[in-house]
C-alpha cells in the first residue's frame, strides 16, 4: 500500500509543469535613475500642499547611492483657514511651502520578484534619508526627510516608485520651531 501511494505521488510530480526562474533583471550598478512624480505634503498646518517631484539617483553599487530630489508645491490655504482669515484677518503662523530641495542616500534593502499572470514583476524595497531646505514664503527652513518605498521594473528601462516619507522642518512659529509632515510620493522614471 505504501509503495502504491509513493508511486502515485511520483507520477503526479512527474506531470507537474516546469518551474521557470527568471534571472535578476533589475540591475542598478553604474546607472542613473531619474523620475518625475506627484506628491502631497501634509503637515496639519492649514496649508494644502500638492506638488511635483523631480528625482535622480546614481547607484555606484547595487546596494545604494546618492540621490537628489526637487519638489515644487502649489500651496493654498484650506477652506477653514480662508474663512478665518477673511472674517478676522488672522493667518496661520506656519510658512507656506513653495519648494523643497533634498540630497541624501537611497539604500536597497532587498530585491524581489513576484509572478503575476505568467509575468515576473521585479522590484526593490528601499529606504532613504535626506537633508536640505524647505523654501517658503518667508525664507528657507532646514529640512530632513526619511522614506521607505518600492521601485518596480515596468519595462527594460522604465520603473515606478511609490514612497512614503516623513519630513521634519525647522521654522519660526509662535509655539514650536519643528514641523513634522507626511510626504507620500508616486513617480515614474527611466534608468540611463
Which residue stretches match the model-derived regions?
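Membrane-embedded beta-strands of outer-membrane beta-barrel proteins
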Residues: 34, 54, 103, 127, ...
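Transmembrane beta-barrel strands of outer-membrane/channel proteins
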Residues: 36-40, 52, 68-72, 107, ...
Amino acid at each position: 500500500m505504501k509503495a502504491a501511494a509513493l508511486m502515485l505521488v511520483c507520477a503526479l510530480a512527474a506531470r507537474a509543469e516546469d518551474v521557470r526562474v527568471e534571472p535578476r533583471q533589475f540591475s542598478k550598478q553604474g546607472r542613473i535613475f531619474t523620475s518625475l512624480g506627484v506628491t502631497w505634503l501634509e503637515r496639519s498646518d492649514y496649508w494644502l500642499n500638492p506638488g511635483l517631484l523631480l528625482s535622480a539617483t546614481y547607484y555606484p553599487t547595487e546596494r545604494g547611492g546618492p540621490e537628489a530630489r526637487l519638489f515644487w508645491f502649489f500651496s493654498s490655504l484650506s477652506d477653514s483657514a480662508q474663512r478665518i482669515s477673511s472674517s478676522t484677518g488672522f493667518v496661520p503662523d506656519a510658512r507656506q511651502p513653495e519648494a523643497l530641495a533634498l540630497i541624501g542616500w537611497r539604500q536597497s534593502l532587498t530585491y524581489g520578484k513576484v509572478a503575476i499572470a505568467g509575468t515576473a514583476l521585479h522590484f526593490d524595497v528601499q529606504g532613504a534619508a535626506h537633508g536640505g531646505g524647505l523654501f517658503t514664503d518667508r525664507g528657507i527652513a532646514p529640512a530632513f526627510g526619511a522614506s521607505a518605498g518600492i521601485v518596480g521594473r515596468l519595462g527594460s528601462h522604465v520603473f515606478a516608485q511609490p514612497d512614503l516619507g516623513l519630513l521634519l522642518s525647522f521654522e519660526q512659529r509662535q509655539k514650536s520651531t519643528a514641523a513634522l509632515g507626511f510626504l507620500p510620493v508616486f513617480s515614474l522614471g527611466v534608468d540611463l
